[in-house]
Amino acid sequence: MVKNSFISVIPQEEKNKGSVEFQVFSFTNKIRKLTSHLELHRKDYSSQIGLRRILGKRQRLLAYLSKKNRVRYKELIDQLGIREPKTR
């Protein structure tokens, strides 16, 4: 399973499924699944709303992690292959 492959990559003390890194990883997987679903079903508006909601949650978690621990934030962004959000 995808979650188990990520858990083996992160350090032993961070195997907590409630950790910020794991939550961001989980949201990223959901985002990728919803994106591929929406490519086939463009008019699925409830899925679009769900995607926007998950994107917002992930963005808030990434902002929190970047404030608390910039090194872990950079590692996570590189590992997941997501862009750093634009700052205002």
From Swiss-Prot:
InterPro entries reported for this sequence: Ribosomal_uS15 (IPR000589), Ribosomal_uS15_bac-type (IPR005290), uS15_NS1_RNA-bd_sf (IPR009068)
GO aspect biological process, one term: translation
GO CC terms, sorted: chloroplast; ribonucleoprotein complex; ribosome
MF terms (GO), sorted A to Z: structural constituent of ribosome
Superkingdom as given in the UniProt entry: Eukaryota
Pfam families associated with the record: Ribosomal_S15 (PF00312)
PROSITE patterns membership: RIBOSOMAL_S15 (PS00362)
Subcellular location per the Swiss-Prot or TrEMBL entry: Plastid, Chloroplast
Keyword match Plastid: yes
SMART domains for the chain: Ribosomal_S15
PANTHER family listed in its UniProt record: RIBOSOMAL PROTEIN S15, BACTERIAL AND ORGANELLAR (PTHR23321), SMALL RIBOSOMAL SUBUNIT PROTEIN US15M (PTHR23321:SF26)
Family per record: Belongs to the universal ribosomal protein uS15 family.
Assembly and oligomerization: Part of the 30S ribosomal subunit.
Name of protein: Small ribosomal subunit protein uS15c
Organism: Calycanthus floridus var. glaucus
